[in-house]
Design a protein with these regions (language model features):
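Acyl-donor (CoA/ACP) binding surface of acyl/acetyltransferases
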Residues: 1-20, 24-28, 64, 68-181
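Conserved GNAT-fold acetyl-CoA-binding loop/helix
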Residues: 30-53
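Short amphipathic alpha-helical segments and helix-helix/interface helices
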Residues: 52-55, 138
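Short loop/turn motifs at secondary-structure junctions and domain boundaries
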Residues: 55-61, 146
Length: 181
């Protein structure tokens, strides 16, 4: 299963994607994308062989899909359970290559990802957590119709500055109203 627009496709990761995904995500010690994706958590590069040990958690999984543009992998969308018994699910997106930032790729990918999740799961809500230093991510969530549900002030510390943790969310009925516009 995959979803496609005129510019991108989201789809499960295939074994053929592993080397490219490793290059984008774990090859470098200080990748540029990490400045926006929770930079207050350490990022550890890893050798390709060690990355391959995780392939069973990456290839053809329901919770981790690739974003493809112009025939190549440029990012990923994911989800994790904050609390599975209550179906509290959080989503994420990373566009690894800066050439694809601010081009609508993340917005399109998350639109398709949210549609996929609401279509295939009995969810009542989808959430997204980011930080106040990533203003682009906050804008994407707002464009998608998400509501800022919580702003926990000055709990993220990076490069000598405190930032807020931002929790955005959307109920199924809000998504249905948003997508019908």
């Amino acid at each position: 299963m995959n979803y496609t627009t005129n510019t991108i496709t989201i789809r499960p990761i295939k074994e053929d994607d592993l080397h490219r995904l490793w290059e984008l995500s774990f090859k470098d010690k200080d990748p540029e994308w990490k400045q926006w994706d929770a930079p207050y958590y350490p990022h550890e590069p890893m050798p390709y062989e060690k990355f391959l040990e995780r392939k069973d958690k990456i290839v053809e999984q329901d919770d981790f899909w690739g974003i493809e543009a112009e025939g190549k992998l440029i990012g990923m969308v994911s989800y994790y359970w904050e609390h599975k018994p209550s179906l509290w699910l959080e989503i994420g997106v990373v566009i690894y290559e800066s050439a694809y930032w601010s081009g609508g790729y993340g917005t399109k990918a998350l639109t398709m990802w949210i549609e996929h999740l609401f279509t295939t799961m009995p969810l009542v809500r989808v959430g997204l957590t980011t930080w106040s230093g990533n203003e682009r991510m906050v804008r994407v969530a707002e464009k998608l119709g998400m509501t800022m549900e919580a702003r926990i002030r000055k709990v993220r510390y990076w490069n000598g500055v405190y930032y807020d943790s931002i929790r955005m969310g959307m109920l199924r009925e809000e998504w249905e109203a948003h997508r019908s516009k």
